[in-house]
Amino acid sequence: VPRAEPYSVAHRSIYPVHQRVAQSFRNGRVLLAGDAAHVNNPLGGMGMNFGLHDSFNLTAKLAKIWHDGASHDLLDLYDRQRRTVAQEYLQRQTIENKKNIEMKSEAARRAFHDELRAIVADRDKLRAYLLRVAMIEGVRRANAIT
């Protein structure tokens, strides 16, 4: 709300940005998903969406175990699939997002915007870009892991 005099700040703290992936998403009957499994910077909204993909993947496996009597080894597959993609994809993409948002150099920002315009102008590049940032590429990669 605009006002004539400045606001007084009662408290402030620096938010430390972390980039980590748990060593395992499974330890016996304990399973990790979302922020419990992987922490990344909040710029770009990737953490919550990636956590939803963890949940969908894990829920499908738990349903097969519960309803179909599938082996609990499926939970190790969950770990392999989602941890691998968190390391290969989520960490890389969130670090890239942070660098892009925090660019200080006008020339670097201009080059980045030019790159985005080139992506938009090329249908194949645009499709590849959207598959990556929408996490569809990551889901496909995870599903390919056996």
Predicted regions and their residues:
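FAD/FMN-dependent oxidoreductases across multiple families
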Residues: V1-M46
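C-terminal helical "tail/cap" subdomain of flavin- and related membrane-associated enzymes
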Residues: R3, Q23, G45, K61-T146
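Alpha-helical hinge/cap motifs
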Residues: G47-G51
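Short amphipathic alpha-helical face segments that pack within enzyme cores
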Residues: H53-A60
